[in-house]
Each structure stands twice: as C-alpha cells, then as structure tokens.
C-alpha cells in the first residue's frame, strides 16, 4: 500500500479530547491488516536504512509500532515504560507536560553500550515524550540518531525539536492542525 492509501486509513475525530482538536485516530489503521503490515514494512525499511541495531518504543502505542518494526527486522525491542512498570532496577528521566510532569523508565541492562537504537512511535506532536526517550536511551549508553513516526503534526514543532538535538526524524505522513 502507498503512504497515501495508509493516510486514508487514519480516522479524524473532531473536537476530541477538547474543542478545536482534530484527533488522529490510528485504531482504524491498526484494524486494517494490510495497512498495518504495510506500515511496519515502511517503518522497517527506514529503520534498516538508519542502521538500527535495536528498536525502542514508548508506552503504549509505541509498543505496537516499535515491536512490529523490531519483528520486521529481526531486532530486539526496548520498551520504554511509565514509572513502576518494570520489575528490574531502572533508570528514568522526568519530562514536562502541558500541565505537570511525567517520567519514563528503562531497564539499563537491556541496552548495550554504543548500540544504535531507533525510536519508533505512532505520532509526534510537541516532541516531549520522544525527547525524553532519547535522553533516557543515551543515559543508558545507546546511540540515538533516528526517530520514526507514523504521523507528524508539524505545526506543533516536535519533529524540529528532535532535529535540533541531532536526531533525524522521518514520518510516514503529516496532518495539518492539532
């Protein structure tokens, strides 16, 4: 399937979760077997070209796409979790949200020093979560130079924020608005 055909599988829900927001709902893409498989192939090819040695994804939808890309390439998957979800010792990073803060954690033993890790997630908006994930992976010893997203919302500036830290950003599709 082409990227335009994949884009047509994304449902837009107006005024969710608040008035004026155009929510880009990936569940319609996830439910479409051929579309989901094509998405993994497109993202997998980009990760392969980036020289990925492992794939990382953030809870929760990053697990779907990140694990799929890892399987596509025969690579390991590094889950980046919310606090208190990993049974082993963890390292973490706090990051700012619009109203407060949050935290991401990883098992540092899962990351090999110098390993080329590509971050994969469903959507990039402001980039806060992806920036925190990159910081965390680097803290664990990984080399992070690439992040892949199904959807970019360029008006929110997240992709540029990642680029400003030296991370190459690729997205399958972009949508105007929030």
Curated annotation (Swiss-Prot):
Catalytic activity: AMP + diphosphate = 5-phospho-alpha-D-ribose 1-diphosphate + adenine
Predominant location category: cytoplasm
EC number(s) on file: 2.4.2.7
Localization terms from the record: Cytoplasm
NCBIfam families: apt, PRK02304.1-3, PRK02304.1-5
Quaternary assembly: Homodimer.
Protein name, UniProt field: Adenine phosphoribosyltransferase
Gene: apt
């Amino acid at each position: 399937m082409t990227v335009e055909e994949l884009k047509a599988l994304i449902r837009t829900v107006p005024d969710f979760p608040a008035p004026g927001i155009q929510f880009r709902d990936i569940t319609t893409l996830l439910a479409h077997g051929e579309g989901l498989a094509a998405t993994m192939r497109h993202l997998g090819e980009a990760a392969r070209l980036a020289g990925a040695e492992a794939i990382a994804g953030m809870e929760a939808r990053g697990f779907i796409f990140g694990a799929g890309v890892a399987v596509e390439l025969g690579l390991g998957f590094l889950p980046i979790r919310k606090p208190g979800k990993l049974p082993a010792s963890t390292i973490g990073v706090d990051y700012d949200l619009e109203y407060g803060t949050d935290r991401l954690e990883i098992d540092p033993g899962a990351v090999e020093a110098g390993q080329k890790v590509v971050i994969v997630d469903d959507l990039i908006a402001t980039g806060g979560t992806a920036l925190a994930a990159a910081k965390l992976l680097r803290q664990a010893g990984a080399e992070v130079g690439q992040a892949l997203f199904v959807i970019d919302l360029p008006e929110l500036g997240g992709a540029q924020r990642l680029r400003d830290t030296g991370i190459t950003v690729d997205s399958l599709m972009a949508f105007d608005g929030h």
